[in-house]
């Protein structure tokens, strides 16, 4: 007898066993006045970028019957020039690889350097896609805790002991860290690099919001170990463009070429990103505005009595509301006031993206009301 389609659930499918019971990644998508939960840049692309993209799309429209540049050479050249200018470290296109968001970059790296019988290490709480990508590539994911009493910094001595014990093939260091916002000093990254038996991926998705020097400066010293992952989703007002990249020794680009899908980066994606990079100086002016707003929000939250981790990113991680309720209850109270923030699963802490000044005012008003109730 044929199965009834409406009675089939995920449990009925021959899913890989290690994926059973898992939840798909994703922040709540709700229609509220102030959406401060996904760490997007709230400023739209400039008219110059919008017009430039429109012109390039019109030019390329007649060529869409052809596959894109398989290796995205022009885009990689533009990214190399940007990274060189932004970090002060000379980078060539042969050292840069681009893909559909940094998630695809990280997935390709795990496909090449992780996999069955191999492990990846992360310092948690951190970017929640790292363990999901590890699971998808059948890479064991092991963790070392970042503790609140240590302001969520990496305890390097504990990290080195864990590396010595577990011998991970891949180590993730997110700096500035998501969701906590703090940075890991280069000296600490270097100690981990020296101890690492495999590769170290430094995830710098929020680097433009920080004054800390980039790990790109360590590439020459650790050519067989270090990969620096970045994105255009945050500082570049380009989350919808889905463009991520990494910087490393050219041998790493050869490695991911073994696992990448053919023609993985669309012609229009490459063109739009190139236009955005042409206007990087103007675009990054929004970063200065967001950093100023971030510092204002942090100062006000502390005035109100909240505990706030020093942020080098475009969001704040705050606690100190136990007398009001747990994380879920406080998250709901913000939502009731038309402010959507993020409960990342760290008990007693919540994360809020820095938005436009009026959005931040709404967030701070809700935060003040909570302390007054």
Curated annotation (Swiss-Prot):
Protein keywords: Amino-acid biosynthesis, Aminotransferase, Histidine biosynthesis, Pyridoxal phosphate, Transferase
Top EC group: transferase
Known catalytic reactions: L-histidinol phosphate + 2-oxoglutarate = 3-(imidazol-4-yl)-2-oxopropyl phosphate + L-glutamate
The gene coding this protein: hisC
Organism per entry: Corynebacterium jeikeium (strain K411)
Family that this chain belongs to: Belongs to the class-II pyridoxal-phosphate-dependent aminotransferase family. Histidinol-phosphate aminotransferase subfamily.
InterPro entries associated with the record: Aminotransferase_I/II_large, HisP_aminotrans, PyrdxlP-dep_Trfase, PyrdxlP-dep_Trfase_major, PyrdxlP-dep_Trfase_small
Protein name: Histidinol-phosphate aminotransferase
N6-(pyridoxal phosphate)lysine carried by residues: 234
Record GO biological process: L-histidine biosynthetic process
Pfam families (UniProt xref): Aminotran_1_2
Record-linked CDD domains: AAT_like (cd00609)
Matches recorded under HAMAP family: HisC_aminotrans_2 (MF_01023)
Listed GO MF terms: histidinol-phosphate transaminase activity; pyridoxal phosphate binding
Functional pathway: Amino-acid biosynthesis; L-histidine biosynthesis; L-histidine from 5-phospho-alpha-D-ribose 1-diphosphate: step 7/9
Subunit structure: Homodimer.
EC number(s) recorded for this UniProt protein: 2.6.1.9
Cofactor(s) recorded in Swiss-Prot or TrEMBL: pyridoxal 5'-phosphate
């Amino acid at each position: 007898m044929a199965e009834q389609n409406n009675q089939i659930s995920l449990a009925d499918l021959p899913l890989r066993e290690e994926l059973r019971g898992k939840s798909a990644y994703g922040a709540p998508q709700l229609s509220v006045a102030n959406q401060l939960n996904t760490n997007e840049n709230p400023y739209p692309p400039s008219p110059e970028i919008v017009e430039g993209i429109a012109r390039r799309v019109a030019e390329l429209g007649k060529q869409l019957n052809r596959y894109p540049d398989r290796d995205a050479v022009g885009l990689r050249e533009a990214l190399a020039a940007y990274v060189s200018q932004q970090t002060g470290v000379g980078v060539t296109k042969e050292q840069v690889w681009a893909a559909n968001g940094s998630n695809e970059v990280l997935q390709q790296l795990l496909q090449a350097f992780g996999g069955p019988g191999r492990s990846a290490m992360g310092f948690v709480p951190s970017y929640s896609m790292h363990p999901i990508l590890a699971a998808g590539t059948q890479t064991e994911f092991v963790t070392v805790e970042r503790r609140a009493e240590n302001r969520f910094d990496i305890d390097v001595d504990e990290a080195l002991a864990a590396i010595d014990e577990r011998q991970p093939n891949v180590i993730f260091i997110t700096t500035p860290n998501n969701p906590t916002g703090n940075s890991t000093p280069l000296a600490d990254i270097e100690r981990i690099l020296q101890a690492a038996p495999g590769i170290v991926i430094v995830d710098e998705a929020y680097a433009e919001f920080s004054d800390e020097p980039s790990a790109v400066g360590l590439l020459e010293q650790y050519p067989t170990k270090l990969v620096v992952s970045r994105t255009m989703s945050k500082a570049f007002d380009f989350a919808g463009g889905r463009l991520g990249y990494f910087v490393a020794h050219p041998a790493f680009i050869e490695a991911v070429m073994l696992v990448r899908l053919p023609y993985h980066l669309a012609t229009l994606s490459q063109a739009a990103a190139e236009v955005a990079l042409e206007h990087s100086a103007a675009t990054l002016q929004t970063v200065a505005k967001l950093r100023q707003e971030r510092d204002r929000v942090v100062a006000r939250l502390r005035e109100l009595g909240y505990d706030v981790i020093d942020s080098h990113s475009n969001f704040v991680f705050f606690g100190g509301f136990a007398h009001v309720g747990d994380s879920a209850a406080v998250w709901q109270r913000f939502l009731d006031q038309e402010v959507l923030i993020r409960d990342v699963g760290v008990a007693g802490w919540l994360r809020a993206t820095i938005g436009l000044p009026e959005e931040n005012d709404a967030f701070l008003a809700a935060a003040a009301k909570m302390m007054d109730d």
